[in-house]
Amino acid sequence: MGRGGKRTWYNGDRREAKRNRPNSIYNGEGRPENLVVGEKKPKRKVACLVGYCGSGYHGMQLNPPSKTIEGDLFDAFVKAGAVSSYNADDPKKVALARAARTDKGVHAAGNVISLKLIMEDEKLIEKVNEHLPPSIRLWDVIRTINSFNPRTYCESRIYEYMVPTYAFVPPKPSSILGNCIMKNSPMPAEPINKENINQLSRSLFYEEGKEFWDDYDIAAKEILSLYEQDPEGFVNPYSKRGAAALANSENNKGSEAGVSAKTNPDMDSDSSAIVNEFLKPDSVEDESAGSKIDPSYRLERALKHIEVLKLKNYRISADRLSVIRETLNQYVGVHNFHNFTVGQAFHQKNSNRVIRSFTASDPFMIGDTEWISCKVHGQSFMLHQIRKMIALAILVVRTGCPVERIQDAFKKTKINIPKGPGFGLLLESPFFKGYNEHKAPENNRDPIDFTKYEQKITAFKHAHIYDKIFLEEARKQVFHCFLSFIDSYNEEDFSYLSDIGITEKTQEVSSKLPDVLSSDEEEDSAENKDDLEG
């Protein structure tokens, strides 16, 4: 038997193995049993404009058996008849590709995937959307040139990151980080020159921080006084049981139970609902009144309630907003972002990235919490880069650190930068300027553009992305937990935020420590991390 015969036997064996292997592209489920094998129909290369909420998904790209956005999309294409039964077992057969491979939990108002679809049905978009959950939408299907690949033709991307303004409140003076800053970063001499952004930022750290935490201390002392009077009988006035006691106290003048309304001015019904959702252990306390719960635990929860409510009532000043904007502006340009991802060395060429703009919106209210929207426009991003950029900006602003510390992070010294919470990040839109201006018109193809779907996309963002972000923050106080962890972490690890700056010792400390707040997302994919964004 010659080489040809050997090759025939080998290929046949491979085909048999391929037929028999289990199919797992349908987000961990088997291939739909109702697929009917029919005649082969012509396919066309297209760009699909999509939007999605990433909550509950293990990222954008197919990764069997994990649940992914592309898994749901491909399943919908098959069920709508846009992918034939011959190709339903393997997305590679239809050349599936994407513009941005968003990370676990990251959302997208606009993203682009390309593949070869059967385009016979005029109602294809409607049919595909019928097979998708409301949190994933197909905006349009656009014919492209045959060589189109959204990743290589995508010239830049805009990401949006939602931040509650209380994230910029200075750390508590008694915390490890707060003490480190006060010990190593003195208040600038009077008078403060507000045109000097670093003097302004440092003065805000001391003045605004003192005002905020002094106000907290007053409320906390009243709670401590109640606790000291009767530790065993102490009831958290911010729990459901405590609120009932407060109402009873107000109805029965002269009663000593509970606290006065003046002691608890922030306890409106909405705040109570949100806080009780966040601090669910207190509902256990209500069910076992008089019980086995340690009184010191009740005190701890009461003090936490006060802190949460004070943070929710924080409103950002114009001066602090100007510091935020100047801090974000430090990222603009071509810089080495080896400190803003994982497994990347300073000398590697692909550590350099282009940031075209980084802006912060005016503050806006959602419920009783104030937010700002930060938008970064860049050529491409590495794994966790945006979340680390946001986290460092927050730390620089809230500690009164010189804004140039951002520039220091682009240098060779390795420093430890934590990842900001992932749920607040969304891909706004990828851009295909070169393709739209040259390749598309030259080949009689429509441009790839999201602008004509702006109203639909805005409505989708509010219904399925923003609301999820705001609700998760209201329920879990994610940013508060994140910053509380940072504030209580090893002093040496974040001493670079003080006037000590980045030194050789900073690198020694960082090299000995794992990435702060690392999670299963950190190891999501060591390979192709250059393609994994957020």
Curated annotation (Swiss-Prot):
Region (Disordered): 1-32, 246-271, 507-534
Keyword Ribosomal protein (UniProt): no
Family: Belongs to the tRNA pseudouridine synthase TruA family.
Organism listed in the record: Schizosaccharomyces pombe (strain 972 / ATCC 24843)
SUPFAM superfamilies: Pseudouridine synthase (SSF55120)
UniProt-recorded name of the protein: tRNA pseudouridine synthase 1
Gene giving rise to this polypeptide: pus1
GO term, biological process aspect, one: snRNA pseudouridine synthesis
A Pfam family the protein falls into: PseudoU_synth_1
